[in-house]
């Protein structure tokens, strides 16, 4: 009997995001929460990369010479600003529909981004290495978290960074990120997140350590409904980000 090969692909997740792929660049559409969240995560990413690689954050292209992977890139909401900051960007997503949308938008924006319809494990198997890996809002959608974290960790060069953003597996997160955001406020299509697939910080930290990475920062990200904006926080009960490095 042949053993089934492990994969990070969850077919139902790919189908879900492919179905709404045309919405990626509509700031008032189904991905509105990501558009609102983007400035906060972009500021954090830029700050930490510039500090790590001794770059001037005020320079027009502070990421020049850095090779960056955005895994689970969707329509390219992070890839495009990373490219504008000077990084050599590879955007990977298991949904060919997402990649088609991302390619079209990058071409319209005059940006040179290497978009690939592929998986983390395929990239790792090919020996790809990066100065920075962005693993943002993806881990809660994959079929095999251990395989996914192993593959993404493997691609971080010595001295390189990996950013991970996801949702905690708590009752508070269930109430706010699933019931509130999907069923009450209708910010996201129903079924975007499944509670049992959410990942706790300690589980993520264990996976990073297993992959040879060292945790260097952890923070929460909270939404202010009055200001309709996101900000950094100490509260990791719902949305949170971690930053890890591979020792040089």
Curated annotation (Swiss-Prot):
Q: Which GO terms describe its molecular function?
A: 2-polyprenyl-6-hydroxyphenol methylase activity; 3-demethylubiquinol 3-O-methyltransferase activity; polyprenyldihydroxybenzoate methyltransferase activity
Report the domain of life of the source organism: Bacteria
Q: What class of enzyme is it?
A: transferase
Q: Which reaction does it catalyse?
A: a 3-demethylubiquinol + S-adenosyl-L-methionine = a ubiquinol + S-adenosyl-L-homocysteine + H(+); a 3-(all-trans-polyprenyl)benzene-1,2-diol + S-adenosyl-L-methionine = a 2-methoxy-6-(all-trans-polyprenyl)phenol + S-adenosyl-L-homocysteine + H(+)
* Pathway per the UniProt entry: Cofactor biosynthesis; ubiquinone biosynthesis
**Enzyme Commission number:** 2.1.1.222, 2.1.1.64
Query: Per the UniProt entry, what is one GO biological process?
Result: methylation
Q: Where does S-adenosyl-L-methionine bind?
A: 41, 72, 93, 136
Q: Which Gene3D superfamilies match?
A: Vaccinia Virus protein VP39
Swiss-Prot/TrEMBL keywords:
Methyltransferase, S-adenosyl-L-methionine, Transferase, Ubiquinone biosynthesis
- General function of this protein: O-methyltransferase that catalyzes the 2 O-methylation steps in the ubiquinone biosynthetic pathway.
Similarity comment: family membership: Belongs to the methyltransferase superfamily. UbiG/COQ3 family.
Q: What is this protein called?
A: Ubiquinone biosynthesis O-methyltransferase
* Gene from which this protein is expressed: ubiG
